[in-house]
Curated annotation (Swiss-Prot):
This is Holliday junction branch migration complex subunit RuvB. The keyword DNA damage applies. One of its GO terms (biological process) is DNA recombination. The gene is ruvB. Its main location: cytoplasm. Homohexamer. Forms an RuvA(8)-RuvB(12)-Holliday junction (HJ) complex. HJ DNA is sandwiched between 2 RuvA tetramers; dsDNA enters through RuvA and exits via RuvB. An RuvB hexamer assembles on each DNA strand where it exits the tetramer. Each RuvB hexamer is contacted by two RuvA subunits (via domain III) on 2 adjacent RuvB subunits; this complex drives branch migration. In the full resolvosome a probable DNA-RuvA(4)-RuvB(12)-RuvC(2) complex forms which resolves the HJ.
Amino acid sequence: MTDDRIIGAGATREDDAADASIRPKRLADYLGQVPVREQMEIYIQAAKGRGDALDHVLIFGPPGLGKTTLSHVIANELGVALRVTSGPVIEKAGDLAALLTNLQPHDVLFIDEIHRLSPVVEEVLYPAMEDFQIDIMIGEGPAARSIKIDLPPFTLIGATTRAGLLTAPLRDRFGIVQRLEFYSVEELTRIVRRSAAILAIDCTADGAGEIARRARGTPRIANRLLRRVRDYAQVKAGGHIDEAVAQAAMKMLKVDPEGFDELDRRLLKTMVDYFDGGPVGIESLAAALSEERGTLEDVVEPYLIQQGFLVRTARGRMATHKAYRHMGLKPKNPPQDLFAEVPDVG
């Protein structure tokens, strides 16, 4: 289920083009994710000092936090080439073999959405990661034979938003595992100011902070909002972005200070107005909103739950007191015992 809202974390074609121009090249320019940055700096320096390829790296976390950017930074720090592909693109074992045999010593192969590799392709990847060798079948039928091809030492970087879907044998072959966390408002403010400087956008610190507060902890959303606020400022404010201009632009975009858009607010309002705050089943909620169940489960709910506006219980979804306060309402009922027995209504 894709999320094409302005506050959606999924990448659009415009995001990909814009990211290329503002993507940091070095760890020193990679803002946020301090523990990850410090660890990778040590691992990279150690590998370069030994003259070895860096251990294979698994990067996981929600979309839009910089997994692809970090892979580019790692390759730049190592001073090697980066080959980019994704799990769904590698359909056959031969596709992977072609990628691996074209690598130079110590090159980095980046596989996005690595959890979507087929089992057949994974089987080829195991000896490549462990022994830098692949087995290829030549011919068909009785004449078929297996040949072993040696590979140069390389680093595989796998990225995924769903680490739980990785098979255990694949996960265990990564020597370095990094989880990317959501960014603080302060970190996002620095990212917005850096992007504004690169794109020659006149943006004050307060204006950047106003954008960062609505970015849902995600740099991709922050940069997308910056581009839309730039458009507004260009037409309405002579190209200058300050706090007031950013607020006016966000009002036009219907993105509130919590980073909620119209669909987020409509879900909470429907739960409160029509279902007394819950608990309510997902099918009933989807019908009331005229939205698909998958859209609510995969696109809308995760951020509301993460921010404490919504909880999932065995009996259904419930709006929290924080949700009532956000809508300017007084909670109608005291918090319910989420573990209470459901009465038997026969």
